[in-house]
A protein has these predicted regions:
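Claisen-condensing/thiolase-fold acyl-transfer catalytic domains that form or cleave C-C bonds
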Residues: 103, 121-123, 135, 140-142, ...
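Short coil/turn connectors at secondary-structure junctions
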Residues: 1-2, 110-114, 141-144, 169-175, ...
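Short, well-ordered amphipathic alpha-helical segments that serve as non-catalytic structural scaffolds
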Residues: 45, 49, 90-105, 162, ...
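Condensing-enzyme catalytic core mediating Claisen C-C bond formation in acyl metabolism
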Residues: 1-86, 174, 183, 189-261, ...
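Conserved beta-ketoacyl condensing-enzyme motif
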Residues: 43, 47-138, 274-289
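Active-site glycine-rich loop that binds ribose-phosphate moieties when present
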Residues: 141-143, 148, 158-162, 179-204
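Active-site-adjacent elements of ketosynthase-type condensing enzymes
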Residues: 125-131, 176-197, 227-243, 286-294, ...
């Protein structure tokens, strides 16, 4: 039986920041000379982001004296321990909200969850996010727990792949996948082009999905297959390391160009001739979407959902592609039986791929069996 995403729930912090405001905030920092200010303004304006969410209220319109910003509006540089303490304080509640939204939308009781898979690369602790989901949602103590940490923006698809395999091994499994990222906890003043690019796109958010192989359940997205491609270049161009003053992002200008060169081969190998109806492309940034669109010769409307999520939420690392899938799941223009190809990019440089089929009408067990026989043939 085919595993299916029954629902996707999302949650964002209450503080929203407009792109032009956060652009001016970074440009006014005391270590910015005129050249850096011009680079900040050009980078932020080219991002095609209008707003983002953050767990840092001092970055909002009201401002204020906080851990990350002083009373004069200057960025502080808290150490990694303090940043991670904020992650431990704030991430579990955001995860709980997204997970509860997914359960409510699916109409699935918490007691039915058999497996939990959590994903995050912006903080760490033990007992970790997987433990907190079980405790905070009142799941059974016997719930199997798994955490995918520090994989980066591409981690949602490996988590969904794990869920699909749990369902294949245990047909009555009901898996809860939760991706939560608090990227803004690692902001810092810097004239480095890599850091300026990171500051211009990254944001905070959480997304959760309920997955089961029970074909009698409600409509959703069938998990058809997954793929991974490790490119021959890019190991030093996209990286995520732990420093003394937070986690440090390496994101060079070569990343979009590498993706542009590699994407056709990776996608052709994965799709093997299939032509998707719709696309869910992780918007690592506007230039990455542009390169994917050009490399795959896609029409502009093919990336509508990806660009809309980038515009309204920014890059929430692993959670972002789940927001895009949620948009496509709710989009009436994406009809029953439509195939959706998903792509996400992470350090390595790694391309994670996924193929989904949208199901508006529940598929019967007999039809599901016939579909698998057709694929096997």
């Amino acid at each position: 039986m085919t595993a299916r995403i029954l629902s996707i729930g999302t949650a964002t912090p209450p503080t929203t920041i407009a792109q032009d405001r956060i652009r001016d905030f970074f440009a006014q920092q005391p270590d910015c000379d005129r050249l850096t200010q011009r680079l900040i303004r050009a980078t932020f304006d080219a991002a095609q982001i209008e707003r983002r969410h953050t767990v840092l209220p001092e970055l909002g319109d009201a401002g204020g004296d906080g851990i990350f910003v002083d009373a004069q509006g200057m960025l502080r540089s808290p150490g990694t321990a303090l940043r991670n303490a904020e992650y431990i304080r704030l991430a579990p509640e955001l995860s709980r909200r997204a997970a509860q939204a997914a359960l409510d939308e699916a109409g699935v009781a918490a007691s039915r969850i058999t497996h939990v898979v959590t994903v995050s690369c912006t903080g760490c602790f033990a007992p970790g996010p997987d433990f907190r989901i079980v405790r905070d949602l009142g799941l059974a103590p016997s719930t199997e727990r798994y955490h995918l940490g520090f994989i980066g923006c591409a981690a949602a698809f490996p988590a969904l792949r794990a869920a699909e395999r749990f369902c294949a091994a245990q047909p009555d499994a009901v898996v809860l996948v939760v991706c939560t990222e608090l990227c803004s906890l690692h902001i810092r003043p810097s004239a480095s082009p890599d850091q300026i690019v990171s500051s211009s796109v990254f944001a905070d958010g959480s997304a959760a999905a309920v997955i089961t192989a029970d074909a009698a359940e409600r409509p959703g997205l069938d998990l058809e297959r997954f793929g991974t491609t490790l490119t021959s270049e890019g190991e030093k161009d996209m990286a995520w390391t732990i420093g003394d003053d937070g986690f440090e992002m390496v994101l060079t200008g070569e990343v979009p160009r590498i993706i542009g060169r590699e994407i056709r081969g990776a996608v052709d190998s994965f799709l093997a001739g299939d032509v998707p109806t719709a696309w869910a492309i992780h918007p690592g940034g506007r230039s990455i979407l542009d390169r994917v669109q050009a490399g795959l010769e896609l029409a502009p409307e093919a990336l509508h959902a990806s660009r809309a999520v980038l515009r309204d939420y920014g890059n929430m690392s692993s959670a972002t592609v789940m927001f895009i899938l949620r948009e496509l799941l709710r989009d009436d223009a994406v009809q029953d039986g439509a195939t959706i190809a998903g792509l996400a990019f992470g350090p390595g440089l790694t391309v994670e791929s996924a193929l989904f089929t949208k199901r508006i009408a529940p598929i019967t067990p007999a039809a599901d069996a016939e579909r698998h026989l057709a694929v096997a043939g």
